[in-house]
Amino acid sequence: MDKKVSRLRRAVPTRRKIAQLRVHRLSVFRSNLHIYANIISPEGDRVLVSASTLEAEVRAQLGGAGKGGNATAAALVGKRVAEKAKAAGIELVAFDRSGFRYHGRVKALAEAAREAGLKF
């Protein structure tokens, strides 16, 4: 079993619990170069809000250096996804770390989203 399969297997129980709660899900994906955050509908069929280090606004705030793979960039993405969610009328979400450890970039994104007003 490789790392990706292990991570996806770790994510299954969390996603099952979130599906039972019937709340919006803040899903995080972390690659070596970028971080992505999506808020998914309770039914799980639509992405309502998204933000990533690929967005022009985030890249401009980072200084154009293209450094999307650090905790500072993750915090900007967390703040941005929270702002977009509040504009869409979403305040309560369940945090889906997608099998990634709650450490480093994933933690920075979550804490920034909380500080910007998302509740989870």
Curated annotation (Swiss-Prot):
GO biological process: translation
SS bond partners: none
SUPFAM superfamilies linked: Translational machinery components
Any one GO cellular component localisation term in the record: cytosolic large ribosomal subunit
UniProt KW keywords: Ribonucleoprotein, Ribosomal protein, RNA-binding, rRNA-binding
Annotated CDD domains: Ribosomal_L18_L5e
Pfam family, one: Ribosomal_L18p
GO molecular function annotation: 5S rRNA binding; structural constituent of ribosome
PANTHER family: 39S RIBOSOMAL PROTEIN L18, MITOCHONDRIAL (PTHR12899), LARGE RIBOSOMAL SUBUNIT PROTEIN UL18M (PTHR12899:SF3)
Family: Belongs to the universal ribosomal protein uL18 family.
Record function comment: This is one of the proteins that bind and probably mediate the attachment of the 5S RNA into the large ribosomal subunit, where it forms part of the central protuberance.
Assembly behavior: Part of the 50S ribosomal subunit; part of the 5S rRNA/L5/L18/L25 subcomplex. Contacts the 5S and 23S rRNAs.
Protein name listed in UniProt: Large ribosomal subunit protein uL18
Organism expressing this protein natively: Bordetella pertussis (strain Tohama I / ATCC BAA-589 / NCTC 13251)
Organism ancestry: Bacteria, Pseudomonadati, Pseudomonadota, Betaproteobacteria, Burkholderiales
Gene name per UniProt: rplR
